A protein has these predicted regions:
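Short catalytic/ligand-binding loop motif for oxyanion handling, primarily in non-cytosolic enzymes
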Residues: 86-88, 194, 208-209, 270-272, ...
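Short acidic/polar capping segments at secondary-structure boundaries
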Residues: 156-165, 178, 189-193, 204-207
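Short, conserved beta-strand element in jelly-roll/cupin
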Residues: 177-193, 254-255, 262, 286-289
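A short secondary-structure junction signal
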Residues: 153, 166-170, 183, 194-200, ...
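Histidine-centered catalytic micro-motifs
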Residues: 170-177, 268-271
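Non-heme Fe(II)/2-oxoglutarate
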Residues: 2-24, 42-48, 52-55, 214-217, ...
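Non-heme Fe(II)-dependent double-stranded beta-helix
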Residues: 2-72, 79-171
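Double-stranded beta-helix
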Residues: 195-267
Length: 343
């Protein structure tokens, strides 16, 4: 064994019991031999079993109707989520006060991120962040994720300029990873059927025998997949193949402003394709933690000093990489209004 492999092997082996999903960057996770013996199948089955136990502990603190909605569909939709006054304040603030922003291009879509304040500076944005990490919302996001924990909401703008020669990878149905995980969007404006709304295959958060078999089959070839997202563990699936899983229909979710959508993105989902140029703004966050740990919460990222500054540090690190000649996928674009068109 080469010295470099001797160093990498124990690190890659330890990551079997982690949220690591990348078949191409981890020789153990990507080993067709080990996956033929059942490694990926085991990771999927065990992570879902552990998530079910953690969800059972969180369920009593949730609204019963939202538990039912999630179990049936894999997502929760809550309209009129923010208090009306706070909603109006944050929309007005984002329209009139520019914030530091970072942008990423994927295909013909631009994603702009603006971190919310990690401390109370008197702004509506800081108040929204506090609301989104209150115990009730935290429990809901943790339940959907299969493990409660800390998360850091950001203002996210999606600017879509349709271009058939440069497709948006988020328009393809996919699962984010192999275990339950949560993303949420608090939409600040109406999102119509032709404005790229969120779509989800109803019930696809459930690990059916057919889905487990499919995960196994994908794992055998994933490390050599031409699609980089597929090789990284975010498996793509065609609409034509959905019938084999025993799930429900592909549901599109146009929503009115001030709607919160929380989804388990182990389920198949996408940004609905549109040929209409659009710009939409939302508050977005994700919660993805080690799926093998038996408890909810109790994570280093939740230490107040760390939690309140994590996003600030992350974006500072991205800027530092860029200055060192290693540009990050997100580039600093200076001060922007949330709804500014992309450069």
């Amino acid at each position: 064994m080469k010295p470099s492999r001797m160093i990498a092997f124990p690190i890659e082996a330890a990551r079997v019991l982690s949220s690591d999903k990348n078949f191409r960057n981890n020789a153990i996770l990507g080993s067709s031999k080990l996956n033929r013996m059942g490694l990926h199948r085991w990771r999927v089955a065990q992570s879902h079993a552990a998530s079910a136990r953690r969800r059972a502990a969180l369920a009593p603190s949730l609204r019963p109707e939202e538990v039912h909605q999630f179990e049936a569909n894999g997502f929760v939709v809550r309209q009129n989520a923010l208090p009306t006054d706070l909603f109006r304040r944050v929309v007005d603030e984002l329209e009139t006060i520019p914030r530091q922003a970072w942008e990423m291009r994927q295909g013909h879509a631009i994603t702009r991120l603006m971190p919310l304040p990690g401390h109370d500076d008197g702004s509506a944005a800081a108040a929204v962040r506090r609301w989104l990490i209150e115990p009730e919302i935290r429990a809901l996001v943790g339940y959907v994720s299969g493990r409660a924990g800390g998360y850091n909401p950001v203002v996210q703008t999606i600017a879509n300029r349709p271009d058939p020669t440069n497709p948006d990878p988020q328009n393809t149905l996919h699962a984010d990873t192999y275990h339950p995980t949560a993303k949420f969007w608090l939409f600040l404006h109406d999102v119509g059927p032709d404005e790229g709304p969120f779509s989800y295959v109803a019930g696809s958060h459930r690990l059916t025998p057919e889905r487990l078999d499919w995960e196994y089959e994908q794992s055998l070839l994933a490390s050599d997949a031409k699609n980089a997202h597929h090789a990284s563990g975010s498996f793509r699936v065609s609409e034509a193949d959905l019938g084999v899983f025993g799930y429900g229909e592909l549901v599109t979710l146009p929503v009115p402003a001030n709607t919160l959508v929380v989804a388990d993105t182990f389920g198949f989902h996408r940004r609905t394709p549109t040929d209409k140029p659009t710009v939409r703004t939302e508050i977005h966050a994700m919660l993805r933690r080690n799926p093998f740990l038996p408890w909810n919460g109790v994570d280093v990222s939740e230490i107040p000093f760390i939690h309140d500054r994590a996003l600030e540090w992350r974006f500072q690190y991205r800027d530092w990489k860029t200055r060192r000649g290693k540009p990050d996928k997100y580039r600093n674009v200076g001060l922007r209004f949330a709804a500014d068109p992309a450069d």
